[in-house]
Amino acid sequence: MLKLQLSNGQIIEVEEGSTLLPLAQKLSDKYASPIVMGLYNGEECDLQRPLTADGTVDFVEVNNSVGMRVYVRTLLFMLIAATKKLYPDVHLEVRNSLGSALYCKDNSERKLTAEDIRSIEEYMHKMAERREPIKLLRLPKSEAIDMACAICSDDNLALLAQVPDDTVLTINLLEGVPGYLFGPMCPDAGYVPHFELLPYADGVIINYPDDGSWQVLPPFVDQPRLNDAYQEAEEWSAMIHCNTVGKLNKIIDLGYAEKIIQVAEALHEKKLANIADILASHHELKLVLIAGPSSSGKTSTAQRLSIQMAVNGLRPIAISMDDYYKNRVDSPRKADGSYDFECLEAIDLELFNEHLQRLLAGEKVKMPKYNFRTGCREYRGNELQLQENSVLVIEGIHGLNEKLTPSVPAEHKIKIYVSALTPMSFDEYNRIRTTDMRLLRRMVRDSQFRSHDAETTLRTWADVREGEEKYIFPYQSSADIIFNTTLIYEFAVLKKYAEPLLRAVPQSAGMAYTTARRLLNILSYVKPLEDEVIPNNSILREFIGG
């Protein structure tokens, strides 16, 4: 018998080889939404996975961001299985997120019609209605690879081949269709009743509920410019044969890593030069606003773009939004009483816009400097006056929000959205989430420059994401230009820095430990890459240093 300690301290005994599913069903009335996953000794655990040792047990319900990942993974498997059943010659590839939706590209010669997509959606809803079981198979490596041959690409099979021979792998089955998706799934299709499929571009959109509102299906909001940026990155990475982890590993093994670094950095330089050309062509331009989520590389982008602007004869002048914080005594507070420095109201908008108007009118302005120690703005004699061809460059989370600069007419400003839209994936069904890549960047940067351990970064990440959802993502569609800061090789470089930080997170850290173990599993598939040949002005240097 195995002894399991529940989150309330209760210890129960279960048979070795039993699963968490009966226990989850027994405790379901204590949760506000369905339990979709277990935490077994702090690590993510499928409810149908056999237990083999004593340990601690907790459960994850669907109505949060972690549980919603299980929901979406299950939904993807339902889409794969339904498509295989109805249209065996159709091959879908999971591409990128668009808000609370996923875009899947149809790579087959026989393209899905709108009627085909409706048929697939109806089939999936019938799966949910009859609670079609999703079986979990734990197979030796050789057997798992044999079964995976029917569903996995050569790149994914190469990744499976590199795991130790004694590894037991998980394969799922839905109506006889095998699936190899990284991470736990729901026990049956009935757990995911809320979704819709929509024809989109060269494929289909899977629309599903937002985190925290699992029973509400929001309307799909198209973001064509963002999707175009994703598609451009994916097509470029495929063109240079480096769009999967398996291909990146092969490039590293063959000794071609330096070349791929040079090509990726050259792409950034080319894109920034193109943006600078666009800015130079706007003869009335006076203000460039740069915004993006955490660890998207805003600071390096602003610095490198300023150099390219100078090449075009412009005179970029950086202004820090931090210097326009209200004095701390006047700062807004959160519900818990702590200061809210992320909201727009934390900025002295009246003073900021007054200074903008005076600067654009050619006046000399005494510029403030915010003292974070005292919590007050100070004036240290710094004055600014714009010259001919001067352009203000302002980086900050609210740059896309029109309420930040209502005093500046639209013809005098350009808004740039910066984000790390990674095109890298493991295979056609297992993508690398952009948020995970940004989290790795932030964790490494916090360790290198802020003396924060990984546990601290992981604990605060939810608050960071909440701020992004409030203050950045709602305005990204208003950007005039999107710059993608991802570097196709960075996953392999971040591995060297991130793994020791993640291993140091103790099991007592709760969900921070769970996230650390999940990220370590993702990183285990990529081979490490040294960073000596990465140029000093690379956006990646903002995070790894050097």
Segments (PLM) and residue ranges:
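Conserved nucleotide-sensing/catalytic segment adjacent to the nucleotide-binding pocket
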Residues: 317, 326, 330-373
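Ubiquitin-like/PB1-type beta-grasp interaction modules and other compact soluble beta-rich domains
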Residues: 1-76, 80-100, 109-110, 122-123
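Auxiliary tRNA-acceptor-end handling modules of aminoacyl-tRNA synthetases
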Residues: 49, 56-68, 91-270, 275, ...
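Conserved NTP phosphate-binding and transfer environment spanning the P-loop NTPase/kinase superfamily
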Residues: 283, 405-546
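Hydrophobic positions on the alpha1 helix immediately C-terminal to the Walker A/P-loop
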Residues: 301, 305
